[in-house]
Amino acid sequence: MPRCLIIGCGYLGEAMVGSLLARGYEVMATTRGGASRTERLASLGATPVLFDTRAPGNLPASDAVISAMAVDRTSGQTMRDVHVDGLRVAVNAIPDKRVAWFHVSSTSVYGQEHGELVNEESPCEPTDASGHTVLEAEQTLKSLIPHATILRFAGIYGPQRLMRTAALMAGDPLRGDPERWLNLIHRDDGAEVVAALVTGNQQGQLLNVSDNQPIHRGDFYVEMARLLGAPTPRWIPRNPGEPWGPHERNNRRIDSSRMLALAGSLLSYRDYRSGLPGCLADHG
């Protein structure tokens, strides 16, 4: 039975466990410890592996590795500590550097902000510290594992992962520009794409991962409000000089045609209209 190790098994990683198990993989997933987290991973069918990049040890041998590391706000670590330095520590803990490696990155590496259509050949010129860190992580991994596949995820949505739900239900105005572009991928579809690439041993790829249906932010929240039975959203502009919120600066259209050619048939949610109802079932 082939073995896959997930380094950083959070919201997306938990879904990947099921997708990999369904494809006949033995799945191992790292955790820094704690009974609740260990029990959670075991309940999903993964073998928990204790690993902390601040006190590193060795990681078990596997046929494939998926790195999907994210910052735990309670850890006191910075984004760079985890995404760059932590990734380097993880690579060094792997016994065989020839292992197939799949890295979950982000479309934040692109800096386009004027509605441009962006594919994998577009220049990476991030405009904020987060994007710079994510790009540095990609570069660090490729310097250590040249054959690694880089997966640049658009915004991940899914159950318990929808912003502004409370504001919509309360009828509060939303701050920002409803005409800015939004790029999305349902969590379960993202997990299926990664698992399919692992199974197909698609090494050395660079892929954007989205549903390939860019939408205006306003349209997304209008649909959310409709499903919630909430008032149609009202928008108010940002104040001059007000810092951008998370992901609000983004205003580009992600082209994921390359990914769709490899794994597009696996997508269950072709756009937000098909994906949102299941995400909001608990609010019905």
Protein language model features and the residues they cover:
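Catalytic helix-loop patch of NAD(P)-dependent Rossmann-fold dehydrogenases
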Residues: 114-150
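A conserved pocket-lining segment of Rossmann-fold NAD(P)-dependent short-chain dehydrogenase/reductase
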Residues: 165-187
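Mid/C-terminal beta-alpha module of Rossmann-like enzyme folds, strongest
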Residues: 193, 197-244
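C-terminal amphipathic/interface module of NAD(P)-dependent oxidoreductases
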Residues: 50-54, 247-284
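N-terminal Rossmann-fold NAD(P) dinucleotide-binding loop
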Residues: 13-14
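NAD(P)-cofactor binding segment of oxidoreductase domains
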Residues: 62-102, 136
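Conserved Rossmann-fold NAD(P)-dependent oxidoreductase catalytic core, especially the SDR/UDP-sugar
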Residues: 89-127
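Glycine/proline-rich active-site loop of Rossmann-fold NAD(P)-dependent oxidoreductases
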Residues: 132-135, 144, 156-169, 196-207, ...
